[in-house]
Amino acid sequence: MRGMGNMNNMMKQMQKMQKDMAKAQEELKDLTVTGTAGGEMVSVVADGHKNIIDVIIKEEVVDPDDVEMIQDLVLAATNDALKKVDELVSSKMGKFTQGMNMPGMF
């Protein structure tokens, strides 16, 4: 029955890891990153769950005759913010899958 002790220990470790992962995911919602474009003329703030929570456009970049430029800057800043969220999630959650060969996981 020696193997049962190892199995119980493994189950406890898995439960702890699951609890730690849930806590880390919960913490992500409180973390924010800021993506920028155009020399910080446009900033987009996102939380760790990829929700865009703020868009800041500096007044001097607003040109009614060039709306397309603002759209491009907002798009670039949003993509920058989402890339930073991916990096944040990877650094926070990657430790849970470290050493496991699980493609597509963090």
From Swiss-Prot:
Subcellular location: Cytoplasm, Nucleoid
Main localization, broad class: cytoplasm
Keyword Ribonucleoprotein in annotation: no
Subunit structure: Homodimer.
NCBIfam families: DNA_YbaB_EbfC
Family annotation (InterPro entries): YbaB-like_sf, YbaB/EbfC
Recorded superkingdom: Bacteria
Role description: Binds to DNA and alters its conformation. May be involved in regulation of gene expression, nucleoid organization and DNA protection.
Protein name (record): Nucleoid-associated protein Exig_0019
GO cellular component annotations of the record: bacterial nucleoid; cytosol
Annotated region (Disordered), positions in chain: 1-23
Keyword hit for Cell wall biogenesis/degradation: no
Annotated GO MF terms: DNA binding
PANTHER family: NUCLEOID-ASSOCIATED PROTEIN YBAB (PTHR33449:SF1)
Family listed: Belongs to the YbaB/EbfC family.
Ranges of biased composition (kind: Low complexity): 1-16
Keyword entries, A-Z: Cytoplasm, DNA-binding
